[in-house]
């Protein structure tokens, strides 16, 4: 029987999920054996809380984690039926975080609403060379929220194609800055123009969940280790950001800027 494994990882440590010597999949293969399928092929720099891979082996998660490199954790496992396809999820949930530089949040919400629904998203997809890749998919929800100096965008959909969320995030932010209007996004949806939209930086994106309606057996030790890792890394980045802010404020006091 095939088995699904829940995987969390720091995407900044790897060159994407697959297709490169330093991608994540070879590391997973060394610990789990042959990979029969995956939930999402995340880009270089994109982290995940709950991606999945499928194998034919049921291994103890303590053993699996002992074989994984720093920044990767297998924290759940579930048996699935023969013929199960991990690409066919009920929903995928991603979070994109960007600095707030005064963007109009209401304009961003209006832009996000345009992108919700079942559409041909060719304007927001980078093809991987396979021109047969479907470009029609369903986005269930996009939420935009400002919290202090940051913009949080939550994307929920059946499936997202290559670079799709990062391109939608760029377009929503551009609308908040007045570079685009919601009507421009509507035009891109109704009359697709492949290559028309750039991608927002990968480091702002995290895969939060892939919903299969399946209950996973959870290995809590790995969850706690992953939580501690991300919290410590956040604190280190927060300290670095505070130092940069202090440097900028010192320059301002010197009337350099």
Curated annotation (Swiss-Prot):
GO MF term (any one): RNA binding
One matching Pfam family: PseudoU_synth_1
Residues annotated as the enzyme's active site: 43
EC number(s) per entry: 5.4.99.12
Top enzyme category: isomerase
GO terms under biological process: tRNA pseudouridine synthesis
Catalytic activity: uridine(38/39/40) in tRNA = pseudouridine(38/39/40) in tRNA
Chain positions recorded as substrate binding sites: 94
InterPro entries named among the record's database cross-references: PsdUridine_synth_cat_dom_sf, PsdUridine_synth_TruA, PsdUridine_synth_TruA_a/b_dom, PsdUridine_synth_TruA_C, TruA/RsuA/RluB/E/F_N
Keyword terms of this UniProt record: Isomerase, tRNA processing
Described purpose of this protein according to its UniProt entry: Formation of pseudouridine at positions 38, 39 and 40 in the anticodon stem and loop of transfer RNAs.
Homology family: Belongs to the tRNA pseudouridine synthase TruA family.
PANTHER family: PSEUDOURIDYLATE SYNTHASE, TRNA PSEUDOURIDINE SYNTHASE-LIKE 1
Protein name from the UniProt record: tRNA pseudouridine synthase A
Originating species: Pyrobaculum arsenaticum (strain DSM 13514 / JCM 11321 / PZ6)
Highest classification ranks of the organism: Archaea, Thermoproteota, Thermoprotei, Thermoproteales, Thermoproteaceae
